[in-house]
């Protein structure tokens, strides 16, 4: 469940239509030299992410992608290909391209196998950042399948429980399951207390971050977003400090988030043959690809239940949760995916709110690429 943003008419904010955001992303990717099919897929995933309110993984990622292409590590002409496959499994090489297209390909292949065999599992190697994991799990639930998506990460930013220096990434998990009457149950979460890009969003908005997201080298909480960004992105990792695992502290069971992050890396990174970032960076040159790994699983509930039974039972579960008496009047119990579904409908109708600080950075990218700025 993503955090709400300030009203779009608040000072320091602009509003852009989903179509303009989509066209802005697409125009920049094409201007950078990405192939039409890859650019269209990436733009579709990114604008859907912004529509869903996951503002850390949509258009705000363009500056990061620009840096990667300038370093030469991002293959703008990537052609993902299947390296090996069985009736149930497959392994894809993303050819060092942006992860969106290879991830869509991976989930589609998992879904095809899920329909035929009851379950399909596909891993991807040699990839880059792929946006929000929830998009790919929702691909499956939109077609009546259960979808699971995991990913390793490039940035070393999460300090293991009892550790001083970061070793892991945010290592996201996304799971989506279809109901009959209700929208799909969709969980999309980092295994750290927060995603590093969410810290970036708070800095763009000029807000402090919640306590417990980031700690310094002494293990003390950091709430100033600018200082948190310095710890996460600007200073040497051996100084220490970073994101906390889910749970925030040993006293609050952060070993569980630490363990989940390890599970994600084993399935998405180790199983696919992708890199482990603390080892990769020892020899990685600026132009070397990140070699991230992804994991996709699609399950057909009809392989286990009579058609419709699973969806009906999930409706009962969701309805029961929604009718749970709230601790505070006016704050009803929500189900994962509720806020994103509501945000998606609202933003489709009223537009996507963007901080002016972000809009200025996008304008600079447009000026550099000689493409029109469409967000005004």
Where are the language model's segments positioned?
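Catalytic-core signal marking the mid-to-C-terminal active-site face
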Residues: 2-8, 12-21, 31, 266, ...
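N-terminal glycine-rich anion-binding loops that anchor highly charged ligand groups
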Residues: 13-21, 34-60, 74-85, 288-291
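Conserved active-site and cofactor/substrate-binding residues in soluble primary-metabolism enzymes
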Residues: 16, 20, 24, 34-41, ...
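Active-site cofactor/substrate anionic-group-binding motifs, chiefly glycine-
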Residues: 57-111
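A generic, well-ordered mixed alpha/beta core segment in the N-terminal half of proteins
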Residues: 87-180, 186-192
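Phosphate/diphosphate-binding glycine-rich loops and adjacent basic-rich segments that engage nucleotide
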Residues: 157-234
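Secondary-shell segments that build the walls of catalytic and ion/ligand-binding clefts
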Residues: 208-276, 283
